[in-house]
């Protein structure tokens, strides 16, 4: 398989392809400014505060009145609160949510005047005014086309904003939902005895049909169905001089080589909570779940390990001198099939790139094994990993990852039956043990 690329898919469907395009903010609070838009107190928006403010604008895109959940704290924040929090962490100086809101409004009015002053004819001015009238203050100063006019901002945050732009979706956090349980009960098939005069017992009830065969003990405890099971999944980087897989660094890793029958059942998450994290158009999570089967849908929360050594790996991408970036996966089945595996990388709920691979079965020890090994990671993902790693704080990385997802769909190539659908969401690991994960079943009550 060749290097990943954007454009029309290869004949065998093996390459990465680009795909579809990708209000608390600015409201409330006193203005805190004079009639000319200048601050009412000297130093309120000093250069260091303004620098941090601009960085925060790039990190936290407009999200209306939605709240963002910071998983390491478990608290919900509006965008202006996050910006104020960022300023405090970066500069040690306190700015309130209302001060942030007022500053956004001041900049929005200033930006509106600048744009209109540069337009010469009245028609263009009217059109620009109508467009800006539909935008909130936060949208006006955060729109990518206007970002360059806002003055200096941190190179790391600005690069990432331009690289990872898109409309914001609602917040999402995996709830700790326990599976529904119900006390056992029994039904007696023997009619009650009665000594009442004239009582005639009803005819004997027909015996119940034999129960359906039980699914494998692991099935409710691992990522898989009776038809197809995920055995292993990993995304990794290998240094240029690697001689075996032990030298690779694992960003994420799932191993289900020996699922334990005694493990607790998977917790459940309502699939509707994450619809907007994935494309709404054909092939999106909602449409796939509507088609089913529902027992084939899973959610995996990864805590990714981004500590992959010194700058030797930072020197290049998958095609350069910085090592090999790849993805490997392995499945097992009792059926002989040809699998098609589609992996869609999504930003703000929009598909960015897709890779489609096909794999035939190998018979091993009475079971059919499917291995998709060392599939090259697309350049988009490699660049994203490097830019993400440049952010100085973990919570900044998690804020970016809040809007990064992957949807992986495995089907039977010949019948087009959906066998497994897995939604992946991400945070940054702080564990000394490296990458961690948790698997959930996706349900819809």
Curated annotation (Swiss-Prot):
The keyword Glycoprotein does not apply. Residues 25-37 have a biased composition (Gly residues). One of its GO terms (cellular component) is nucleoplasm. Residues 1-47, 191-217 are annotated as: Disordered. Interacts with YAP1 and WWTR1/TAZ. It holds the Pfam family YBD. This is Transcriptional enhancer factor TEF-4. Residues 199-216 have a biased composition (Pro residues). The keyword Transcription regulation applies. Highest expression in brain. High levels also found in lung, testis and ovarian follicle cells. Lower levels in heart and spleen. GO terms for biological process: cellular response to retinoic acid; embryonic heart tube morphogenesis; hippo signaling; lateral mesoderm development; mesenchyme development; nervous system development; neural tube closure; notochord development. Signal peptide: none annotated. InterPro entries: TEA/ATTS_dom (IPR000818), TEA/ATTS_sf (IPR038096), TEC1_TEAD_TF (IPR050937), TEF_metazoa (IPR016361), YBD (IPR041086).
């Amino acid at each position: 398989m060749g290097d990943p690329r954007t454009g029309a898919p290869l004949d065998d469907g093996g390459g990465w392809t680009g795909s579809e395009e990708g209000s608390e903010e600015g409201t409330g609070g006193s203005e805190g400014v004079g009639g000319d838009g200048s601050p009412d107190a000297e130093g309120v928006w000093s250069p260091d505060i303004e620098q941090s403010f601009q960085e925060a604008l790039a990190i936290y895109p407009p999200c209306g009145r939605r709240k963002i959940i910071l998983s390491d704290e478990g608290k919900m924040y509006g965008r202006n609160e996050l910006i104020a929090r960022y300023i405090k962490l970066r500069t040690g100086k306190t700015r309130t949510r209302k001060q942030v809101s007022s500053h956004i409004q001041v900049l929005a009015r200033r930006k509106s005047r600048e744009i209109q002053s540069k337009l010469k004819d009245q028609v263009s001015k009217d059109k620009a005014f109508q467009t800006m009238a539909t935008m909130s203050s936060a949208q006006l100063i955060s729109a990518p086309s206007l970002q360059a006019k806002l003055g200096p901002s941190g190179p790391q945050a600005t690069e990432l904003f331009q690289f990872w732009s898109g409309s914001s979706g609602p917040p999402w956090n995996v709830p700790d939902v326990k599976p529904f349980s119900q006390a056992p009960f029994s039904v007696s098939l023997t009619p009650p005895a009665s000594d009442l005069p004239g009582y005639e017992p009803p005819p004997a009830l027909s015996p119940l049909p034999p129960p359906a065969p039980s699914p494998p003990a692991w099935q409710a405890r691992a990522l898989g169905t009776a038809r197809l099971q995920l055995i292993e999944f990993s995304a990794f980087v290998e240094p240029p001089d690697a001689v075996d897989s032990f030298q690779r660094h694992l960003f994420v890793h799932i191993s289900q080589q020996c699922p334990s029958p005694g493990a607790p059942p998977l917790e459940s998450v309502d699939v509707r909570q994450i619809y907007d994290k994935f494309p709404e158009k054909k092939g999106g999570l909602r449409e796939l779940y509507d088609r089913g089967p529902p027992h084939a849908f899973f959610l995996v929360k990864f805590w990714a390990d981004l500590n992959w050594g010194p700058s030797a790996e930072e020197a290049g991408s998958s095609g350069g001198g910085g090592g090999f970036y790849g993805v490997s996966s392995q499945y097992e089945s009792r059926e002989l099939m040809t699998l098609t595996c589609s992996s869609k990388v999504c930003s703000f709920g929009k598909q960015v790139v897709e890779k489609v691979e096909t794999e035939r079965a190998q018979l091993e020890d009475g079971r059919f094994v499917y291995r998709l090994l060392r599939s090259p990671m697309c350049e988009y993902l490699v660049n994203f990993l490097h830019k993400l790693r440049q952010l100085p704080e973990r919570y900044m990385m998690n804020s970016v990852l809040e809007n990064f997802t992957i949807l992986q769909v495995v089907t039977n190539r010949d019948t087009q039956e959906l066998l497994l659908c897995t939604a992946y969401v991400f945070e940054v690991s702080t564990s000394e043990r490296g990458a961690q994960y948790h698997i959930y079943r996706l349900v819809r009550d």
